[in-house]
Amino acid sequence: DNEPCSASPPTAPARSGCWSRPTGSPWASCAPPCSRSSTDRRADVRPAQPADILACAALCTEIHGFDRSGELKDAIEQKTAVVVEHLDQITGYATLIGFFGHAVARTNQDLMAMIAAAPSFQGPGFLLPTRNYLVFSWCLANGLTLVMQTTLMTIGLYNEPAGAYFPGVLY
């Protein structure tokens, strides 16, 4: 059910929202303009290649404290993984823009570039921490709909990621 939602402040509890495009939405056609931030920072999104795994693993370790290169390798083989580059350096990757994928990015602009470049979202949408107000409000402004609100739960120690991300349900 698509209930109206309000933006959460940056200090909100750990919640994620599942996002999808409304049926017939023109948002998918806005990929080129949406791939630039308000500061016109150029970010290029392309399919991930096996040669990208080490750089992506290092980025994931920088953001999360561990790497998820096994999942990335599988996603590259399935041709669902993408990377975003800025100044010829990988600044983010996604195994899949969808419910079962995850993404890691150095900046919010890198995460938004990958979302904007996605031709579709797999499954019911993708999970996005709604406490990331900048990306949350950008999604709303670009016609995405909050489908459900969820709570991030962990067993044991949890370290807040040091960058932009969206979690996957499989890890």
Model-predicted regions and their roles:
Residues 2-3, 11-14, 46-171:
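Intrinsically disordered, low-complexity, positively biased terminal segments
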Residues 35-50:
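Conserved N-terminal entry element of GNAT/NAT acetyltransferase domains
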